[in-house]
Amino acid sequence: KRSLGLTRGKNDELDAYKIAWFSYLFRDELSPSKMPTKTMFKLKSLMGERYRVVKAAATEKQVLKELFKQLDSKSIRRIKHRLKILTADIKAIEDEVKELVQSSPALKKNYELLISITGIGLVNATMMILCTNNFEGITNARAFACYCGVAPFEYSSGTSIRGKTRVSNLANKRMKTDLTNAARSAIVHDPEMRIYYKRKRAEGKEYGKVINAVKFKIITRAFAVIKRGTPFVKLRQAG
């Protein structure tokens, strides 16, 4: 609200002047951004559609679970019919996402590198590509961890305030949720991650902090395979 300082009145001309003035002051720190391609815009649209359909399916499943005994047979059949349609829609969208990714050599390469990591599937790989503009907009793991609310920050002031180190709420919440799902999957299917998780929990670390650490490990793996250009290889001695 007060980002322009103490100003009285507001109009487009004043706003344009302030933006131009600010840009001129920090011209040495500015770097040109690269617009996403048409393929990326289409990919974003498809993932948004998938998110909405998955949310609708989850609502129907919850209604069926909570009110199963109260609903009559006709209502149950209608809910199951809607779920069948929604499930088919999700598969159709995911198939279209795969086709779109395969149509672009650059997207295909990074996508296949990402899904070589245990815990990362279609959703996480595609969302990472979208959020980083195919790893051209965000190019390092720490910056991406900050973007999706995984990087911890210190909260302190002087000598009297010593708050806990915690993650920020200023984040891409959808990407953060997807990474949580990836972390849970990795703990189950990746021996190295499972050992790490159990060790940290045995040390008394909170569940949320350990899951967050696993998410960061997945992020670092993702950026490592993209940088190297080779698929992720599991450690044989783990497990």
Regions found by a protein language model. Give the residues of each.
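Low-complexity, acidic/Ser/Thr- and charged residue-rich accessory regions of DNA metabolism proteins
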Residues: 159-163, 197-239
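Short helix-capping/linker segments at secondary-structure and domain boundaries
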Residues: 26-31, 133-137, 185-192, 222-234
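Phosphate-backbone recognition surface of nucleic-acid-processing proteins
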Residues: 116, 122, 126-207
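Amphipathic alpha-helical interaction segments
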Residues: 18, 78-81, 85, 127, ...
